[in-house]
Amino acid sequence: MAGLNIYVRRWRTALHATVSALIVAILGLAITPVASAATARATLSVTSTWQTGFIARFTITNSSTAPLTDWKLEFDLPAGESVLHTWNSTVARSGTHYVLSPANWNRIIAPGGSATGGLRGGLTGSYSPPSSCLLNGQYPCT
């Protein structure tokens, strides 16, 4: 009988260790890495201006090891300026605040990759550059 109790104790200890290791492994796999905007950066620069308009280009770069999905690039334009057309993005407007969102083909930026696009703006009066540019609502553009 004593030999059976030792066998049962060893078996239970081994079973508990195996189950514990399995639970830790499953929980570890359930937490997948997500790219944060802190590991991404954006630039928005005006490349040309003329009396009634301007062209601006943007680049969003994913420096993380996970895909960056559904990015948002937002900025403000002064009164008298507006976005007339975008490429490689869609645009939403609320007053003088604009938000560029990805097109269907560039909504996921692979690790180490980037998405580029631009916009054509119209203006009345003198030109002022976009301001308050943020990536994903919190990280300043360069």
From Swiss-Prot:
CBM2 domain ranges (all copies): 38-142
SMART domains found in the cross-reference section: CBD_II (SM00637)
Signal peptide start and end residues: 1-37
Assigned keywords, A-Z: Cell membrane, Cell wall, Membrane, Secreted, Signal, Virulence
Subcellular location: Secreted; Secreted, Cell wall; Cell membrane
GO biological process, one term: carbohydrate metabolic process
InterPro entries: CBD2 (IPR001919), CBM2/CBM3_carb-bd_dom_sf (IPR008965), CBM2_carb-bd_dom_sf (IPR012291)
Pfam families: CBM_2
One MF term in the entry's GO annotations: cellulose binding
Highest taxon of the lineage: Bacteria
Gene3D superfamilies documented for this protein: 2.60.40.290
GO cellular component: extracellular region; plasma membrane
PROSITE patterns cross-referenced by the UniProt entry: CBM2
Function statement: Carbohydrate binding protein that binds chitin and cellulose. Lacks enzymatic activity and does not hydrolyze chitin and cellulose. May interact with mycobacterial biofilms, which are rich in cellulose, and play a role in biofilm formation. Could also act as an adhesin, improving the initial attachment to host cells and aiding M.tuberculosis during the initial stages of infection. Recombinant M.smegmatis harboring Rv1987 shows enhanced cytoadhesion to human lung epithelial cell line A549. When expressed in M.smegmatis as a model mycobacterium, Rv1987 acts as a virulence factor that modulates host immune responses and contributes to host immune evasion. Can attenuate the inflammatory response induced by mycobacteria and alter lung microbiota composition, leading to the dysbiosis of lung microbiota, which in turn facilitates mycobacterial survival in the host.
Leftover remarks: Identified as a drug target. Also identified as a potential subunit vaccine candidate through a systemic immunoinformatics approach. Rv1987 exhibits a strong potential immunogenic response useful for the development of a tuberculosis vaccine that would be used in tuberculosis models to generate humoral and cellular immunities.
Name of this protein: Cellulose/chitin binding protein Rv1987
Annotated source species: Mycobacterium tuberculosis (strain ATCC 25618 / H37Rv)
